[in-house]
Amino acid sequence: MSLAAGLSAAESGTPPAGKNPTADGYDGIWYTSRGYYSGGFALFPSQHSPFAVYRGEVQKTFFVYGGTVRGKRQLQAMVSYYDHQRGVVPRPTIVHDWGESNLKPGQMADGHRNPTLVVDGDGRVWVFVSGHGDNGYVYRARKPYCVESFDRVIETPMTYPNPWWIPNRGLFLFFTKYDHSRESFWLTCPDGMSLADLATWHTPGELNAWTISPDGDKYGHGNYQFTAARGSRVATAMNNWIGRTRDRSNLFYLQSDDLGRTWQTADGKPFSVPIRTAHCAALIRDFWSEQLQVYIQHLTFDSQGRPAILFLTASAGQAAEGPGGPKTWTVAHWTGERWAFHPVTTSLNNFDCGSLYAEDDGTWRIIGSTLRGPQPWKTGGEIALWTSHDQGATWKMLKQLTAGSLYNHSYVRQPVDAHPDFYALWADGDGDKPSPSRLYFCNRAGDVRILPQAMTGSFAQPESAAAWSSSKSASRPGSG
């Protein structure tokens, strides 16, 4: 049974016949927030996950991203897949078009409204379209392993959706609501759940209950959560906003092995949710006492199922972009006895982002925008591949994946159960001004390919990014 059991065409929010429209190529959204961050944000923000899922039974990597209408700043939730047998991608499917909403023009390009996805036990693709302090949407594919047509399942207040499929147990969804501040919740939907049951979103579990206190509690402005799943375990790493500034700091971790009925810290000790104060057993490290900001990038598990968190630190009060102190990429790893902290490298922007891989043979990798790009100090840069062979204690840059780029590359995302041929996905975009945005992926060795921006047929083969750069260097699209 799948999540979709019990759904009828009449219960869904879209007509029962026909296919969703498609685009004639892969164009990412360009987005900015008051100069705080800007660029090609098709895979933004870091607290959205997952963006891609590999399913071996059909040898396809399904993925979503924030697309756009070429020449406009109009966000569309897109879904597609990479066919590993044929080495091709289809035209991407438009699942949700924010241009058809009643949002203000500036909100129609808001990268916070990007989608995430999950593939259920029957192979149906579910797309979770984020709101931003308002309603989001959930869509499900009509056919297993097919992204041609979707039905809307529900509309509900939902920001930063993180859906995870737990084998033989169902869906676990982390998400955020902006009731008082940024408050984190979870929701479970076992196999066979009907729409009527799925609609009981008014009683989700609550992970934190920070509120803005009258006395200006410096920790009381909510949090961001970054999640992962392995087997029956779900986990969340969190930071929190500090006072009425834009600083965010501290590092928290919680996990559950029973779909949220009980929660534990990394050492297995019970923890009663929600978190109500920063100084609690879930706090890994009080970075604010060290006057450091914390920007979490990715949460994963090592080969023994122990959590590892990739994050960046910057001096308190320091602007996200521009000259200043170092932005230090750091790995926090639970060794089984304690949290160990290991620096990796430094970069130029608080919102630089990568993915952490802890492989079964003991190799750890980071793929991310750690190198200076063509728009220095802006979000992203050039992409590099780093490796560690001592559980993240020391790191070496193995390979630079992009170089001489026209735009910064940003938000490198790891697929669930990543196939070696489709190991990371990201986008580029001008960090200074609106521009076109292309989508890229690489294999485990770091060879980069670019998704086609213009398609004349139903399928196309992604080009080598190096070959594309050489052939298009004289005719690259300018800023729009």
Regions found by a protein language model. Name each.
Residues 1-4:
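Bacterial N-terminal signal peptides
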Residues 7-8:
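Cleavable N-terminal signal peptides
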Residues 12-472, 476:
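Extracellular, repeat-based ectodomains that mediate carbohydrate processing or recognition
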Residues 478-480:
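Short, solvent-exposed mixed-charge patches
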